[in-house]
Amino acid sequence: MAGLWRAYQRLLGAHPWKVQIVTAGSLVGVGDVISQQLLERKGLKGHSIERTVKMMGIGFCFVGPVVGGWYKILDRIIPGSGKPVALKKMLLDQVAFAPCFLGCFLSIASALNGLSGEQIWGKLKRDYKDALITNYYIWPAVQVANFYFIPLYHRLAVVQFVAIIWNSYLSWKANKS
């Protein structure tokens, strides 16, 4: 396991942006598998590989680049370290970024599932508030720890490992009828 971590560290050092994006996409896919198998209990025969691929695509093309880029911007807006800085970053993340990100995520997943603009709007009206409230139960504490203890280039990976559970929830929320 330590050897895998060292290899990941080397790759991250050589290609930080690419590795962060691949990590995010892969872990969004893992979250979807968990959603389908544990939350929805679809079994192997009922598992939608197409859905998992779509969710991974969202991870590669949206989650990885957007969240990774956001962390870089956040470090420029609020430079430094320490508890007060971590708290400020968490507050800005949760007040400004999380609501927009969540709405975009649900909209993109719905569009990839073939919903019309009107249907996407209905889904957002039905599911967005609940998803945002659930976000606030989980992410403030995670983000304070992330911003206080974790270096910039590891933040996306740390968040995505914690987010395996969150991604399972989001996949379920985004794909339920």
Swiss-Prot record:
Organism per entry: Xenopus laevis (African clawed frog)
Keywords associated with the record: Membrane, Mitochondrion, Mitochondrion inner membrane, Transmembrane, Transmembrane helix
InterPro entries the UniProt entry points to: Mpv17_PMP22
Compartment list: Mitochondrion inner membrane
Domain of life: Eukaryota
UniProt record similarity statement: Belongs to the peroxisomal membrane protein PXMP2/4 family.
Location, primary (coarse class): mitochondrion
Any one GO molecular function term: channel activity
Transmembrane segments: 11-31, 55-75, 95-115, 132-152
Signal peptide: none
Designated gene of the protein: mpv17
Name used for this protein in its record: Mitochondrial inner membrane protein Mpv17
Site-annotated residues for Determines ion selectivity: D93
Keyword Ion transport: no
CC per GO annotation: cytoplasm; mitochondrial inner membrane; mitochondrion
GO biological process, any: regulation of mitochondrial DNA metabolic process
Function: Involved in mitochondrial homeostasis, and control of oxidative phosphorylation and mitochondrial DNA (mtDNA) maintenance. Non-selective channel that modulates the membrane potential under normal conditions and oxidative stress.
Topology in membrane: Multi-pass membrane protein
